[in-house]
């Protein structure tokens, strides 16, 4: 994988046109990482690239490490919303947005785990969190996904 003219190049990269983003991103100095909360990397990338959708991201990284680039790195993506961090507002103006394909919070029924959209997740892909005397269950990230993220960053 290489970087050429603000886009990633390589066999593992799929580019989707996201024509709604046109403002220049001058000097990004921050990376904002999100979970998609979707059913797949491709469906999340297509949703984010859709002209009618009010959000976008530079990249979506799938569970096998595949990459979807929606917005070049020299163009502002709309991934951080109305944000503030360390005294700065509107982080979209300073940051690259990367989405990791992940179902997010899961629901347990007996010994099974399900996404918000009804897909069953195997127990080996579930992280259990215990806070304030309450259990919650989350979809884990995959090793290929995290390796790709590290390589990109």
Positions of predicted regions on the chain:
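Active-site-adjacent loop/helix surface patches within enzyme catalytic domains
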Residues: 2-153
């Amino acid at each position: 994988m290489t970087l050429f003219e603000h886009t990633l190049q390589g066999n593992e990269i799929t580019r989707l046109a996201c024509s709604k983003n046109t403002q220049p991103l001058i000097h990004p100095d921050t990376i904002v990482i999100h979970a998609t909360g979707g059913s797949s990397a491709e469906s999340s990338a297509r949703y984010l690239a859709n002209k009618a959708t009010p959000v976008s991201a530079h990249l979506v990284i799938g569970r096998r490490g595949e990459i979807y680039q929606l917005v070049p790195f020299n163009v502002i993506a709309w991934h951080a919303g109305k944000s503030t961090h360390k005294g700065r507002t509107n982080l979209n103006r300073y940051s690259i947005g990367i989405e990791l394909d992940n179902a997010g919070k899961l629901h347990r029924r007996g010994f099974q785990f399900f996404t918000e959209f009804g897909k069953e997740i195997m127990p080996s892909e579930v992280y259990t969190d215990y806070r304030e005397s309450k259990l919650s269950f989350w979809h884990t990230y995959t090793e290929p996904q995290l390796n790709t993220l590290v390589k990109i960053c």
